[in-house]
Amino acid sequence: MEFDTIAAISTALGEGAIAIVRVSGDDAIEKVDRIFKGKDLTQVSSHTIHYGHIVDLDTNQVIEEVMVSIMRAPRTFTRENIVEINCHGGLVSVNKVLQLILAQGVRLAEPGEFTKRAFLNGRIDLSQAEAVMDLIRAKTDRAMNVAINQMEGRLSKLIGHLRQEILETLAHIEVNIDYPEYDDVEEMTHNILIEKATHVRAEIAKILETSKQGKILREGISTAIIGRPNVGKSSLLNSLVQEKKAIVTDIAGTTRDVIEEYVNVRGVPLKLIDTAGIRETEDIVERIGVERSKEMMSQADLVLIVVNYSEALTNEDEDLFRAVQGKDFIVIVNKTDLPQEIDMERVTDLAVGNRVITTSLIEEQGIDELEKAIADLFFEGTIDSADMTYVSNARHIGLLTQAGRTINDAIEAIENGVPIDMVQIDLTRAWEILGEITGDTVHESLIDQLFSQFCLGK
């Protein structure tokens, strides 16, 4: 496949030590060499770095002092010639370098175009390309490991094996249909076909078993901290974040808006939402905050209910317990450093089997137990993201689910005595659906849509 030469700034814009301009294309080296004062880049070896200066050809003025990396096709990310120019960080100089490159007839890259070329040139498949963005967005070590595993092609290999098994079954059916007179070909009986289809269905189900944990690692858990005013919600947020993000006072109703913060709890990414204290109020601004708190509570994956150890449960407390029934929630009984007034038996009854953790946030007690409870709630035992293949992408999960249903339709058809050549249609469809995960059978418009979500320069 032949493409034009593209360039973009690959590092985040702003002040910093280093900024990188990436150029990819058959004549990338020649284009950069025109504005580079130093060694003749067209003659240097691949995968080498060279010191020099970028020069404005119109004024012969030195624009930047740079280090230039030369990588020759096909041993590059895009399988094209790649040049990476390491400039000083900042807005003016790096943009000037980019402008000088574009002036040589190079096109500004679209978002994700470098990774798209890696896919179109066969270096990576679609699932590996999507893992690149997952790695960039990873918020925990576990999420990073899952993304790296997918980038290395672990999911691709699993999908490839399944597609190959379906393809061999389809070929076997085809031989039986077209050449029934061949005695040396094993007859594709209904029993053999059910056995093969059942195995594929089981393998798909096995992959999908990791989807809940995979999605959590990729997207995080939306976690709402709720409770009456002044029970310690903001203190809980600050303790989990290990930084003062929310105002903590003895004045009820201090938090009037929703505060969001990402935090890594034992490898589990939480999107923490500290809500306004829920109570009846005449204050218009506070009332708006209370309504938003209830909305966030209904949308959250996990709810942390905070109650006060030094106060008896109120009707408002009990209403909160009723409101979260059917959701994952943990009860935090805070302020155990003060005399007990709360009925712990009643709290346990209202928790209906969910974990109850006692804390004294002012004395930093109970946070470790809470973090363990959160991790245990979503990950039974230990999660080994280094050795397992987790499916975390919603697109992949949807396609695997669809393929599993199609295989199930094929099995039901076989059991109902449908002719094998009709069953072949369902198996072929399942093979095509699985191919959409790796990009083997995906439509071009979907490819464009997926890569448009990438950042510029990647």
UniProtKB/Swiss-Prot annotation:
The keyword Nucleus does not apply. Gene3D superfamilies: P-loop containing nucleotide triphosphate hydrolases (3.40.50.300), Probable tRNA modification gtpase trme, domain 1 (3.30.1360.120), tRNA modification GTPase MnmE domain 2 (1.20.120.430). Binds 1 potassium ion per subunit. One of its GO terms (molecular function) is GTPase activity. It is found in: Cytoplasm. (6S)-5-formyl-5,6,7,8-tetrahydrofolate binds at residues 22, 84, 123, 458. One of its GO terms (cellular component) is cytosol. Mg(2+) binds at residues 234, 255. Keywords: Cytoplasm, GTP-binding, Hydrolase, Magnesium, Metal-binding, Nucleotide-binding, Potassium, tRNA processing. GO terms for biological process: tRNA methylation; tRNA wobble uridine modification. Its EC number is 3.6.-.-. Its cofactor is K(+). It is an enzyme of class 3 (hydrolase). Exhibits a very high intrinsic GTPase hydrolysis rate. Involved in the addition of a carboxymethylaminomethyl (cmnm) group at the wobble position (U34) of certain tRNAs, forming tRNA-cmnm(5)s(2)U34. Belongs to the TRAFAC class TrmE-Era-EngA-EngB-Septin-like GTPase superfamily. TrmE GTPase family. This is tRNA modification GTPase MnmE.
